[in-house]
């Protein structure tokens, strides 16, 4: 079977049934440039960190990964991963703050590298939008900063 790649992005001679299990079919990405801060104790969207992807089959896996610099002078910055309007990536444990990622700084000022990864199986072939949201736990200094630092608005992305 011959495969032809065209300058406009089309590929002839390749279809889903001829691809081996585990093949990467779609790839989308988002990048946060600059900084964002919040004092909110309820979740807010992180601007520029959302992607829409359409699974090719009902058993398609969607792999989501992220890495960012986070600063919170006291206590905890909390993040959750959403598929459309539903929170996903909830750990199986109970109690405490159970979301995709938390950053507890314990009164240590600085920019902390925070990462997460999750694979999702939406179970259909509809387009889905994945996004990351953040909030603060409050504390004596409630502001959460991403891509920056508590005492400096410069970008550290």
PLM regions and their residue ranges:
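Generic alpha-helical hydrophobic packing signal
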Residues: 9-10, 50-52
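Terminal beta-strand-rich extracellular "head" domains
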Residues: 31, 36-42, 52-61, 65-127, ...
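Short intrinsically disordered, low-complexity coil segments enriched in acidic
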Residues: 1, 24-25, 152-157
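Short, solvent-exposed loop/turn segments enriched in Ser/Thr/Gly
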Residues: 45-48
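Glycine-rich, low-complexity segments
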Residues: 2-35
């Amino acid at each position: 079977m011959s495969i032809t790649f065209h300058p406009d992005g089309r590929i002839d001679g390749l279809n889903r049934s001829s691809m081996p299990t585990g093949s990467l079919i779609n790839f989308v990405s988002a990048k946060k440039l600059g900084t964002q801060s919040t004092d909110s104790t309820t979740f807010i969207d992180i601007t520029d960190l959302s992607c829409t992807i359409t699974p090719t089959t009902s058993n398609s896996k969607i792999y989501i990964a992220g890495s960012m610099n986070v600063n919170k002078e006291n206590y905890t910055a909390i993040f959750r991963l959403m598929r459309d309007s539903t929170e996903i990536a909830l750990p199986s444990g109970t109690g405490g703050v159970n979301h995709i990622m938390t950053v507890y700084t314990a009164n240590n000022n600085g920019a902390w590298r925070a990462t997460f990864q999750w694979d999702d199986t939406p179970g259909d072939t509809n387009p889905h939008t994945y996004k990351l949201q953040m909030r603060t736990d409050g504390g004596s200094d409630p502001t959460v900063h991403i891509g920056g630092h508590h005492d400096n608005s410069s970008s550290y992305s």
